[in-house]
Swiss-Prot record:
The keyword Nucleotide-binding does not apply. GO terms for cellular component: chromosome, telomeric repeat region; nucleoplasm; nucleus; shelterin complex; subtelomeric heterochromatin; telomere cap complex. It is found in: Nucleus, Nucleoplasm; Chromosome, Telomere. It comes from the Eukaryota. It comes from Schizosaccharomyces pombe (strain 972 / ATCC 24843) (Fission yeast). One of its GO terms (molecular function) is molecular adaptor activity. Component of the meiotic bouquet that facilitates meiotic nuclear reorganization of the telomeres to the centrosome. Links telomeres to the meiotic centrosome component pcp1. Essential for the formation of normal telomere clusters during meiotic prophase. Required for telomere length regulation and chromosome segregation. Required for proper positioning of nucleosomes at heterochromatic loci and for transcriptional gene silencing (TGS) function of the Snf2/Hdac-containing repressor complex (SHREC). One of its GO terms (biological process) is telomere-telomerase complex assembly. Its main location: nucleus. Interacts (during meiosis) with pcp1. Interacts with clr3, pot1, taz1 and tpz1. Residues 514-719 form a coiled coil. Keywords: Chromosome, Chromosome partition, Coiled coil, Nucleus, Telomere. This is Coiled-coil quantitatively-enriched protein 1.
Amino acid sequence: MSEINDFTNSIIINESDTKYEVYSEVNSSNRWIAKEDCPSPLEDVWLLKLAGHKRKLEEPLSCMRNEEPASKQREIEKFLRTDLDHSENDFLTQEVDEFPSTQQLFPIPLQNDTAFDSSEESITKSSKSSFSVLDIGLPMSALQRKMMHRLVQYFAFCIDHFCTGPSDSRIQEKIRLFIQSAHNIAKHPSLYDTEVRNPSAAESTNSHVSLDASNFSSYAENSSKFLFLQELFKNLSPSYSKTFFLFISNQFLANTLTQWLKSQNIDAELWAEEDAKTSQHPAIWICVSKKAPSASHFLQSCPDLSATIFYDIEAYMSVTSSLPSIQSLVLRLIHLGSIEHAIKCFQSSYNASFLVNIVGVVATLSSSSEENSEASNLSTLFEKSGNFEEILGSESHSSITEKTRDIAKNVATWLKNGENFSSWPLPPLMDLASLSVAEPRDSQPSVSQVNDTFVKSSDSTFPSSQSMQSPSKLHSLTSNATDLLSSSSLKKNFFSQQEADEVELSNNYDLQGAAVQYLQRRLRMVEDELHEAINSKNVQQSRSEELEQQISKLTDNLQEYRNTVRELKLDLEKSKKKNEDLSKLEVEKVEEIANLKKELTHLAKQQEFGFKYVQEFSNEDLQGKLIEANEKNYKLTQLLKTQKEDADFITNQYQNASTFAAEQSKEVAKLQAECKRLQAINSKVMEEVKVYNDSRVEALLAKVSSLEETLKILEQKSLPKFTPHNQSPRIIDSN
């Protein structure tokens, strides 16, 4: 029974194919148990704990799924994370309620409370201001294009519904989210990380917020506006002495742009209210649009002001609504193919269809070529303009950088040459008004043409310029056609009442068919979302399995930590004992110190007693003895000095002699070795000479003997000449 209790209080921390690894909380030990030998209560407890652990993991996931707005934003975030960089991921994680309304997106007074109804008078007033506005079209970076494409892909259903079908408050909120995200992309991609991860930094007005210098290069790479401003001031300096004033709608971007320009050795400063009275001006003042009233006097009276630059379209609309008159030249930076470009092209027709056109055109421009294959007027427009690559984003990064630098160089040259408007070096921006999705073309279409266009629009992923028609416009066209037919029948009796009913029935049938196709497309979108939800569930399940493995590893680490704590407790007890021994030793040392102090006191008393007798001698005697001792000490010192010098001399002599003796010994040894060598050579030579002499003597003796023999022979040969006459001839012949 106790063993079962031990098992019940145990935890299975690991599992193999045939065994369980069990950690016992009673004795704090691990052991392996075969599965067939493992009691069933232990397995039941293990399974219950495992099920409880899985429930704990699934609880936060279910809570996430129950949060309708937040979960939708997480779907957006997950969708945008696919094959994207870190800087592209987190820009749609805020709640929908946190995004500003249409009135805040376009800071122009509205006539009523309708979300998408604005004042035509206000936009006409701002567009017809007294100052001259020159638009500088800059290509979007690859990152901005990719983010816009992903953004349109995600909001495709809402965009299609908003442009072709009836839109309720939920669709309008999503469209507000889409518009705000498109504005942020047009400003700078780095804005999202700051707004999502650190909202206080994005809203902060502190101009001394430090930025990571390693990321400075990414600011110009991700936005051609940063690169344009850098190249513009590099081409202007140092000969150009006038100052510029730049308006920007976001405080964080203002801080970032200021510090980035300073890092490029450009004199840039943030504008403050107290700067209106200063007489010294940098190369460029950077001002947030909400501070525009404080700069009104400066813009009107500064003689050194060259131009007022608007970084984004929001800043332009906000500033021009509060400052209707600007005396200087106005330059407006616009990304080609962005929402800024669309607003610029449609601001002359600011009516109820304004946002429908903006959303539809931006969706069309940010879609792929396959998605825009049905938009024939789109390709015709690009062929006429010649800016196909700039709008659809088929240019490379190096080409975008080179084009931006050329634009900045041309603008700088134009400013240096006197700002002649007739010689403005940049071509006008492409007019996107022909891509209108909520207004009719040159010729008014018939009712059947409108219905056919409405049916065709259901087959495309994104509404093209031909296929998208607003529901209000469609209804008005149908009503106008019906009214026209009715009035004609009354005046000329051309149509009968039966024919009018047939026309109305045909129109209703076409509308129902379009609605069916719209619902089918919506069903496909829901199926895609369901597929993504299933994939997300699989990812979460794999993540839970990874967490289980991590928990098992953490359990092992916990056991190691417990063992470490036990060892530390033992060390603590040893330390306590050691401290007790040290405290005892300290007490003994204190007692020893006290005894030594007593001895010192006793010795001091004895010393005082001895000094009494020393003090009885007279000072004169002591001084005389001291003088004698000093003289004696001086003599001994001199003697010691002399002896030391003698000793040093003797030592030096001895050392020199020793050195010389060692050298002589080495020389003698060397000479002895040389002598022995020469003796050996001499003896060898003598032996060779002796051998040579002996051999020579022997050779000479042999030669002498041979000569003697020869002489004898010769003598014998010469004897007949001196032979006596009485010698016999036979003897002579014999000789």
